[in-house]
Amino acid sequence: MLAELPQPQNLTLLTLNTQYVLTWDWDQTTTGNSVSFTVEYMAKYKMKMKKKNWSRVCERTTRTRCDLTGSDLHYLGMYVLRVRASADGVDSDWVNKDFCPDIDASLGPPSRAELAPVGNLLDVTISDPLTSTQHSMKEHVLFLYYRILYWSRSDDPQGLKPKVLDSSNNLVTPPELEAWAWYCVMIQSRYDYYNKTSSYTEPQCMQTEGDTPYGQIFLYFLVSMMVCFLLVLLSSYAFFRFYRGLKNTFYPSIQLPAHIQEYLCDSSPGSDMPRLITADSEAELCCDKLTICPEVVLLEIHVPPPLTAPPSELEQDSGRHIRQDSGDSGIYSTEGGSAQQGRSGGEPIRRDQEVDSWQTLEQVKMEEMGRELADERDLDEGVVDVCV
């Protein structure tokens, strides 16, 4: 005869809105790890029928819990849940538990809460708790309402006394709020028929608004004027710098020297356009050094002896020298010619006149030689580069 298998103990339901999970306890020391469990349910009104038709949810599971959310249990229905253990072909007795979602299921908080300032008030928008199929719980709980706790954040936390506001609406505006103050809000779902209450939502804080003070308006205006002034000043300074740079680039204050401007500008009168490069200027320029040397002329100076009257031979020599020097000076040739003409004409010439004429010619000749020597020194020092 097989030993009896003990039953599961402490059947408990974990619920929230329409989510249901059945849990139980089991002593692992009795059978080890080979035990399995089976969970079934049936509507309670069918228990009086002779033929009972149980719906199986979990079969031979090794876990000590079973999720009934997908069984589509009606929220207002009453059901009987049962669990048994099985090990080595031996089944334990069934353990039953009654379950009514409307009575036993916990109520969840609002799925979402939002705050929005409206003047010196706050609008609180509340979203209903949701079922497992994402529908509102108000479809199952008709008298569902919300309790709203709100308080000023500037209050002393030690002596905090929040104000309470109950409403079944999804949009609530707490009264008697101050302008430009911070308020915090927490919301709870409630169902008084079965005394169901949810947990509160996380605190949310928002600042109220109101009429803008005149001092604040004046401050905004002053700041705006300062910003505009700075923008205009910066724009003007940037434009001035740009204009100055452009002017200095195209119209510099320092002008080029006149000889460079003559080279850059067109040679035609009244033209300010730069002279274009011609084809001749592109040719290669070759320069050679050219030295100009004057022609060397040998001069002869004949000093007559200190005689009171020159002899006849000296008269002839003087005429000859005058004729030789006629190629160098027009004055000499003229004087010499006049002397010859005088002799050829047979006119008598006095000795004292000839001596004076000869001395005058020698003095003129010496002065001409001095000028020529000075010109020779200047020519020797000058060197000119000639482009070929």
UniProtKB/Swiss-Prot annotation:
The chain crosses the membrane at residues 217-237. Keywords: Cell membrane, Cytoplasm, Membrane, Receptor, Repeat, Transmembrane, Transmembrane helix. Induction: In the fibroblastic RTG-2 cell line, induced by polyinosine-polycytidylic acid (poly(I:C)), a synthetic analog of dsRNA, that binds TLR3. InterPro entries: FN3_dom (IPR003961), FN3_sf (IPR036116), Ig-like_fold (IPR013783), Interferon/interleukin_rcp_dom (IPR015373), Type-II_Cytokine-TF_Rcpt (IPR050650). One of its GO terms (molecular function) is type I interferon receptor activity. It is a single-pass membrane protein. Residues 331-342 have a biased composition (Polar residues). Heterodimer with IFNAR2; forming the receptor for type I interferon. This is Interferon alpha/beta receptor 1b. The lineage of its organism: Eukaryota, Metazoa, Chordata, Craniata, Vertebrata.
